[in-house]
Protein backbone atom coordinates (compact mmCIF):
# COMPACT_ATOMS: atom_id res chain seq x y z
CA UNK A 1 0.00 0.00 0.00
CA UNK A 2 0.97 3.65 -0.19
CA UNK A 3 0.70 5.73 2.98
CA UNK A 4 -0.19 8.98 1.21
CA UNK A 5 -2.94 7.38 -0.89
CA UNK A 6 -4.20 5.36 2.09
CA UNK A 7 -4.41 8.54 4.18
CA UNK A 8 -6.18 10.40 1.37
CA UNK A 9 -8.70 7.55 1.00
CA UNK A 10 -9.44 7.65 4.76
CA UNK A 11 -9.96 11.42 4.56
CA UNK A 12 -12.20 11.10 1.49
CA UNK A 13 -14.34 8.45 3.18
CA UNK A 14 -14.64 10.57 6.35
CA UNK A 15 -15.68 13.54 4.18
CA UNK A 16 -18.46 11.44 2.61
CA UNK A 17 -19.87 10.83 6.09
CA UNK A 18 -19.78 14.60 6.79
CA UNK A 19 -21.38 15.48 3.42
CA UNK A 20 -18.23 17.53 2.80
CA UNK A 21 -17.75 18.04 -0.95
CA UNK A 22 -14.62 20.15 -0.41
CA UNK A 23 -13.12 17.44 1.81
CA UNK A 24 -13.61 14.92 -0.99
CA UNK A 25 -12.47 17.04 -3.92
CA UNK A 26 -9.30 18.39 -2.25
CA UNK A 27 -7.77 14.98 -3.04
CA UNK A 28 -8.69 15.12 -6.73
CA UNK A 29 -6.59 16.38 -9.61
CA UNK A 30 -7.84 19.58 -11.28
CA UNK A 31 -8.63 17.51 -14.39
CA UNK A 32 -10.18 14.56 -12.53
CA UNK A 33 -13.07 12.62 -14.06
CA UNK A 34 -15.88 10.98 -12.07
CA UNK A 35 -18.02 8.35 -13.80
CA UNK A 36 -21.08 7.75 -11.60
CA UNK A 37 -23.51 4.95 -12.47
CA UNK A 38 -26.57 5.89 -14.49
CA UNK A 39 -25.38 9.46 -14.91
CA UNK A 40 -23.24 11.82 -16.92
CA UNK A 41 -19.50 11.96 -16.39
CA UNK A 42 -18.28 14.83 -14.25
CA UNK A 43 -15.08 16.47 -15.50
CA UNK A 44 -12.80 18.62 -13.36
CA UNK A 45 -12.57 19.18 -9.63
CA UNK A 46 -15.05 22.08 -9.70
CA UNK A 47 -17.73 20.18 -11.64
CA UNK A 48 -17.33 17.14 -9.38
CA UNK A 49 -17.64 19.39 -6.33
CA UNK A 50 -20.88 20.87 -7.71
CA UNK A 51 -22.23 17.37 -8.42
CA UNK A 52 -21.41 16.26 -4.87
CA UNK A 53 -23.06 19.35 -3.35
CA UNK A 54 -26.20 18.52 -5.33
CA UNK A 55 -26.14 14.96 -4.02
CA UNK A 56 -25.64 16.15 -0.43
CA UNK A 57 -28.64 18.49 -0.72
CA UNK A 58 -30.80 15.39 -1.09
CA UNK A 59 -28.94 12.63 0.78
CA UNK A 60 -26.66 12.08 3.76
CA UNK A 61 -24.36 9.08 3.88
CA UNK A 62 -24.76 7.59 7.35
CA UNK A 63 -22.87 4.31 6.90
CA UNK A 64 -19.73 3.58 4.90
CA UNK A 65 -17.52 0.49 4.98
CA UNK A 66 -14.85 -0.89 2.68
CA UNK A 67 -14.58 -4.67 3.25
CA UNK A 68 -12.20 -5.12 0.29
CA UNK A 69 -9.45 -2.88 -1.06
CA UNK A 70 -6.46 -3.44 -3.30
CA UNK A 71 -3.95 -0.78 -4.35
CA UNK A 72 -1.29 -1.33 -7.00
CA UNK A 73 1.38 1.32 -7.57
CA UNK A 74 3.28 1.41 -10.85
CA UNK A 75 5.62 4.36 -11.33
CA UNK A 76 3.65 7.61 -11.12
CA UNK A 77 0.27 5.88 -11.28
CA UNK A 78 -1.71 3.83 -8.77
CA UNK A 79 -4.78 1.70 -9.36
CA UNK A 80 -7.31 1.16 -6.59
CA UNK A 81 -10.03 -1.50 -6.60
CA UNK A 82 -12.48 -1.59 -3.72
CA UNK A 83 -15.81 -2.91 -2.59
CA UNK A 84 -17.85 -0.33 -0.70
CA UNK A 85 -21.00 -0.72 1.36
CA UNK A 86 -23.00 2.39 2.17
CA UNK A 87 -26.33 3.80 3.25
CA UNK A 88 -27.67 7.07 1.82
CA UNK A 89 -30.54 8.54 3.84
CA UNK A 90 -32.79 11.15 2.21
CA UNK A 91 -32.73 14.60 3.81
CA UNK A 92 -36.48 14.81 3.22
CA UNK A 93 -39.06 12.40 1.93
CA UNK A 94 -38.11 9.17 0.22
CA UNK A 95 -36.45 5.86 0.84
CA UNK A 96 -32.91 5.23 2.00
CA UNK A 97 -30.52 3.67 -0.50
CA UNK A 98 -28.33 0.80 0.68
CA UNK A 99 -25.74 -0.42 -1.79
CA UNK A 100 -22.63 -2.54 -2.25
CA UNK A 101 -20.52 -1.01 -4.96
CA UNK A 102 -17.43 -1.90 -6.94
CA UNK A 103 -15.05 1.06 -7.13
CA UNK A 104 -12.03 1.67 -9.37
CA UNK A 105 -9.88 4.73 -8.75
CA UNK A 106 -6.79 5.87 -10.65
CA UNK A 107 -4.20 8.04 -8.90
CA UNK A 108 -1.33 10.09 -10.36
CA UNK A 109 1.83 11.32 -8.64
CA UNK A 110 2.71 14.93 -9.47
CA UNK A 111 6.24 16.22 -10.06
CA UNK A 112 6.35 17.39 -6.42
CA UNK A 113 5.60 13.83 -5.24
CA UNK A 114 2.00 14.34 -4.09
CA UNK A 115 -0.72 11.93 -5.19
CA UNK A 116 -4.16 12.94 -6.45
CA UNK A 117 -7.02 10.91 -7.80
CA UNK A 118 -7.55 11.44 -11.53
CA UNK A 119 -10.45 9.10 -12.28
CA UNK A 120 -13.10 7.22 -10.34
CA UNK A 121 -15.88 4.92 -11.47
CA UNK A 122 -18.30 2.70 -9.58
CA UNK A 123 -21.24 0.42 -10.14
CA UNK A 124 -23.56 -1.53 -7.88
CA UNK A 125 -22.57 -5.07 -6.95
CA UNK A 126 -26.20 -5.86 -6.07
CA UNK A 127 -28.40 -7.68 -8.59
CA UNK A 128 -30.60 -5.41 -10.70
CA UNK A 129 -34.28 -5.39 -9.85
CA UNK A 130 -35.34 -7.42 -12.89
CA UNK A 131 -39.07 -7.18 -12.14
CA UNK A 132 -38.87 -3.37 -12.05
CA UNK A 133 -36.83 -3.30 -15.26
CA UNK A 134 -39.37 -5.56 -17.00
CA UNK A 135 -42.24 -3.33 -15.87
CA UNK A 136 -40.46 -0.18 -17.11
CA UNK A 137 -39.65 -1.85 -20.44
CA UNK A 138 -43.26 -3.00 -20.90
CA UNK A 139 -44.53 0.48 -20.02
CA UNK A 140 -42.12 2.13 -22.47
CA UNK A 141 -43.07 -0.35 -25.22
CA UNK A 142 -46.76 0.35 -24.66
CA UNK A 143 -46.31 4.11 -24.90
CA UNK A 144 -44.47 4.03 -28.26
Language-model segments: which ranges?
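A beta-strand edge to alpha-helix "cap/lid" segment located at domain peripheries
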Residues: 1-26, 33-144
Amino acid sequence: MNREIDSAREQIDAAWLRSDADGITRHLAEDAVLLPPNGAKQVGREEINTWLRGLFQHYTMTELAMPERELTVSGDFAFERSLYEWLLVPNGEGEAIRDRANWVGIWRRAANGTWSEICGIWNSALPADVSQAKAETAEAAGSS
